[in-house]
Amino acid sequence: MTAVDAPDILDYDEVLTKYEPVMGMEVHVELGTATKMFCPCPTEFGAEPNTQVCPVCLGMPGSLPVVNAAAVESAIRIGLALNCSITPWGRFARKNYFYPDQPKNYQISQYDEPIATEGYLDVILDDGTTWRVDIERAHMEEDTGKSLHVGGATGRIHGASHSLLDYNRAGVPLVEIVTKTIHGAGERAPEVARAYVTALRDLLKSLDVSDVRMDQGSMRCDANISLMPIGAKELGTRTETKNVNSLKSVEVAVRYEMRRQAAVLDAGGEVIQETRHFQEADGTTAAGRRKETAEDYRYFPEPDLEPVAPSAEWVEELRGTLPELPWIRRARIQKDWGISDEVMRDLVNAGAIDLVIATTEAGASPEAARSWWLSYLSQQANTRGVELGALPITPAQVAQVVALIDSGKLNNKVARQVVDHVLDGEGDPEQVVAAHPELVVERDETKLKAAVDEALAANPDIADKIRSGKVQAAGKIVGDVMKATRGQADAARVKELVIEACS
C-alpha cells in the first residue's frame, strides 16, 4: 500500500461503522519547583529569553547534573495519587536525538526504570458514568527549550526565514504520564480523552505540584490515535497529535484525527506513523515529522547520575501528605451543598469546582457562586475562547458582585455589566461601581413612581387588566419601567409600585 492524502475527511458516524478507535494519552506536566531538574537555574515563566540558563542546562562540557529532590518528591506524590507502584530503584537515561531546542543533543529522561508504574485514574463522563483509564507509567525528565520560527505564515519551521531559540525552559522538571492503550470507547473516544485530561488536571492541581496552565505550556497533551477495522485483531498505525493546548482541543483533535485516518484508509492509502500538529484555528491536524521508535533514541543509563532509590518509609511519609483528592472532595461537597449528580457533573465538566469553592470562601452563597460560574462567566469564557479559570476575574471579585446584589446596589442585569468592566481590566467591582454610578440601582421612590405612572398612562388597557385582578399583566409595565431606567431599577420593587398604583 502507498501513503496517500485523504480526499476528504469522513463523517464521524461513518467512521464508527467501519473502525474502532484506539488511543493512548501522554501528558507532560511541568513541576512547580523553584529550580530546574538538574541545576539551580530558576524556572520563572515569562522571563527574558536565555536569562535563566547555566552551563548544566546548556550542556557545556564538564558540567555535571544534580537531581532536584523536590522534583522527585512531586513525582512520587503524583504516582501515589494515580494509584501507581513506586519503584524502589529507578534510573535516569539519556534519550539521544538532535533538535535545536535540545542543547545537549540528548534529553535526560527515564526509560525502562521509571519512578511510577501500573496505576489508574477513574474519570467521569458527561452522562455521569465512570471510565477507568489505566496508567502505564509516570516518569521524570527535563523539558526542552522553545523555538520561535520567524517569517512564515504558520509559525512553524516550514516557510520560516529563521528561528530563535530560548533555553529558559530547557531543564525545567517534567513528569510525563503515559496511559495504557485505551480501547472500547467507540464513539465516546474523544469524550474519554477530554474527560481524562480534565480529571488529571484537577488531580495535579489538588496536589499543588504544578499550575497546570495548558495555555502557558505547563501541562501539554499528546494524543496517540489509531484505527482498527471492526473485527480486526491487529492495531492500526498510530499518529501522535501535539500542540493540544486546551481541554476542548483534546476532544476536537481526537475526533478530527479519527475522521482523517478513516478517509486515508478508505482511499486505499496507509496511515503514516508521524507526529501531527493540532491547528487551533480550524480544528484540523497538519503533518509534522516522521515518528521515531524507542530504538531510534538509543537510550542508555545516564552515567552522571546515581539511581533514584526512594525508601519505603519515605514513600509512606509522602503518602501521608496527600491532600483530599478530587473524587473524595466532590462527594463531600455534593453532600454538604445538597446538590444533584447532574449539578455536580456540570461543575466538573466546566472545571468550576475550585472556582465555586473559592467564591463561597470569599462570602458568596454556594447557589449564587454556582450560578455565576456556570452561566454568565461560562458564556464569557466561550466567547473569549479561554478556559473558565483563565478569565481575568477572581473568585473574590465574583463574591463582591454577589454582595453588591445582596445589598441592593445592583440587580442581576446591571451586575453583568459590572462583571464586563471587571473582565476588561477596570478593577474590582466596588471600583467599577464607583467609576460608573449610572450602574447603581435606582432607589429614589419619587423617580420610580413617576416612571410607573408614565408607563401606566401609556398603556391604559394593561392598567385596567391589573385593576381587574390580572396581576401577571404587570410584567409589561415593569419591562417598560426597566427600559426607561436603563435597567437600573429593582424589578421586584417596580412590580410592587405598579400593583400599588392600580389598587
Curated annotation (Swiss-Prot):
PANTHER family: GLUTAMYL-TRNA GLN AMIDOTRANSFERASE SUBUNIT B MITOCHONDRIAL AND PROKARYOTIC PET112-RELATED, GLUTAMYL-TRNA(GLN) AMIDOTRANSFERASE SUBUNIT B, MITOCHONDRIAL. Keywords: ATP-binding, Ligase, Nucleotide-binding, Protein biosynthesis. It is an enzyme of class 6 (ligase). It comes from Rhodococcus erythropolis (strain PR4 / NBRC 100887). Gene3D superfamilies: 1.10.10.410. It catalyses: L-glutamyl-tRNA(Gln) + L-glutamine + ATP + H2O = L-glutaminyl-tRNA(Gln) + L-glutamate + ADP + phosphate + H(+); L-aspartyl-tRNA(Asn) + L-glutamine + ATP + H2O = L-asparaginyl-tRNA(Asn) + L-glutamate + ADP + phosphate + 2 H(+). Allows the formation of correctly charged Asn-tRNA(Asn) or Gln-tRNA(Gln) through the transamidation of misacylated Asp-tRNA(Asn) or Glu-tRNA(Gln) in organisms which lack either or both of asparaginyl-tRNA or glutaminyl-tRNA synthetases. The reaction takes place in the presence of glutamine and ATP through an activated phospho-Asp-tRNA(Asn) or phospho-Glu-tRNA(Gln). SMART domains: GatB_Yqey. Its EC number is 6.3.5.-. GO terms for biological process: glutaminyl-tRNAGln biosynthesis via transamidation; translation. This is Aspartyl/glutamyl-tRNA(Asn/Gln) amidotransferase subunit B. Belongs to the GatB/GatE family. GatB subfamily. One of its GO terms (molecular function) is glutaminyl-tRNA synthase (glutamine-hydrolyzing) activity. Heterotrimer of A, B and C subunits.
